[in-house]
Regions:
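Charged, helix-rich terminal subdomains or tails
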Residues: 1-196
Length: 196
């Protein structure tokens, strides 16, 4: 939220003549400061290397499935982060789920626990990895996971469930939306951790 506020104020003050690229990572308090600076600096470089700069790289690096290359999966133009991740994916999940640390309990919302969000993230990462290999097994797995969540039709959460299935099915069709959903899930995990 702070990073977005800083970016918006800079754009306002400079009439969009100066852009900002950033690297954002979260660390435990005991993590060495020199390593924090190094990782965040690498993330900033990744953001600056994004086409046209004016980007943000989030969370850190992953090793690809071969273990050969470190990649940052969460790199966005600022407007894409705001519009596609926060105002679309995160907002939709907020409307459909009770998320500890983000919203209040409502009878019409499904409960989102850490186990479910981590499983969803694992399957989304699998879908993104599968695309490069032409496989589709994780699409089937995510649809199976959603089918197991289905409440009875007279349950007040049934409408939220139907909307969730429709949204996720639509989002996993494109790499961009799938990646944005994964980023939104990561943000939810960090919000949930913040409640402790």
């Amino acid at each position: 939220e702070l990073a977005i506020d800083i970016r918006e104020k800079l754009a306002e003050v400079t009439d969009n003549k100066i852009t900002i690229s950033a690297g954002l990572a979260l660390f435990s308090p005991s993590y060495p400061i020199s390593q924090m600076a190094a990782i965040t600096g690498l993330l900033e470089s990744v953001a600056k290397d994004n086409d046209g700069k004016d980007s943000i790289a989030l969370f850190g690096f992953e090793t690809n499935s071969n273990g050969e290359e470190r990649i940052c999966r969460h790199v966005y133009k600022w407007d894409d982060l705001i519009n596609n991740v926060i105002e679309d994916k995160l907002y939709t999940l907020d409307q459909l789920f009770v998320i500890p640390g983000i919203n209040e309990v409502q009878d019409s919302k499904m409960k989102l626990g850490k186990g479910l969000i981590y499983k969803l993230m694992e399957l989304l990462q699998g879908i993104l990895n599968d695309r490069a290999l032409g496989k589709h097994i994780n699409v089937a797995r995510i649809l199976y996971l959603l089918a197991r969540l289905e409440p009875k039709k007279n349950n007040p959460t049934y409408e939220s469930y139907k909307n969730l299935v429709t949204a996720i099915h639509r989002w996993i069709q494109s790499e961009e939306d799938c990646k944005a959903l994964l980023t939104a899930c990561n943000l939810i995990v960090y919000y949930m951790r913040d409640t402790k």
